[in-house]
Each structure stands twice: as structure tokens, then as C-alpha cells.
Amino acid sequence: MVMSASSFSGFPADAHILGLDIGSISVDMVLLDGLGTPLYSRYVRHHGQPDKVLCAELEALERTHAGIAAAVTGTGADRVARLLGACAVNEVIAQVAAASFRYPQARSVIDIGGQDSKYIQL
């Protein structure tokens, strides 16, 4: 599924939607409002302790933003999604959706991660 402005039509404007990427090197996150506008983003190297970093980051977010819905991708996505009651999303699908939503004119995505690299032609 590729996201568009209408993808957010089911959310109230004051909703909080969190995208998490649990990678082999870092925990990356972006918090969007119900219109898809970024409210917060963070990149944190986890030094082999992704759960510890994720817990600290989520606790900080919960102090300032209530009612967060989450989707998780990356190396640890399935396990973290189960723990949080969130949905796990394949990382290529997440990258295509994000690039298409934020940069509709984009024709490709290059992802250089800690574990692998990918070229995606849109």
C-alpha cells in the first residue's frame, strides 16, 4: 500500500502515529499527526541494546503525546510489534510508502543500513 494524503483521512488531526525502525545499529522514529505532518523525529544508536533505548524513547514520548498508534519495521520489527501491540511492516514497503508520501516526485530509494543495502526503483 502506498500512502497518500487520503491515507490519513481516517485519523483525527490530533492523532499521533509513530513509525519505528528497529535496526541493527539504531532505533529511528518519526511521530506524525493525523494529517501526516511530522511532529518529532529521532535517530538513536543503540549499541546492541535496542530494547533499552526503545523503552527510554517511548517513555519520553508518552510524557508529551497521548494515544500513540505505532507501526514497526526493521530487524527487530516482529518481536517489538508483538510487545507493543503494534503492526509490523516490511521495511521495503515502509520505505516505498514513506518516499511516495513525502516525495511524490521521487523515482528511487537508496537505503544503506547497518546490515544490508537496497536500491528500490519506484
Residue positions per predicted region:
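A short, basic/flexible loop-to-alpha-helix module at the beginning of a structural domain
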Residues: V2-P12
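Short glycine-rich, Thr/Ser-proximal phosphate-binding strand/loop in the N-terminal lobe
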Residues: D14-K52, A56-E59
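Short glycine-aspartate micro-motif
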Residues: I17-D21, A69-A71, R107-I110
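A short acidic Gly-Thr/Ser loop motif
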Residues: D21-I25, T75, I112-D116
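Short beta-strand-loop/turn "lid" adjacent to the catalytic site in phosphate-handling enzymes
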Residues: G34-L35, Y43-H46, L61-I93, Y119-Q121
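Glycine-rich phosphate-binding loop of actin/hexokinase-like ATP-binding domains
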Residues: R42-Y43, N90-L122
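Alpha-helical scaffold segments in soluble metabolic enzymes
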Residues: V53-A56, A60, R79, A98-F101
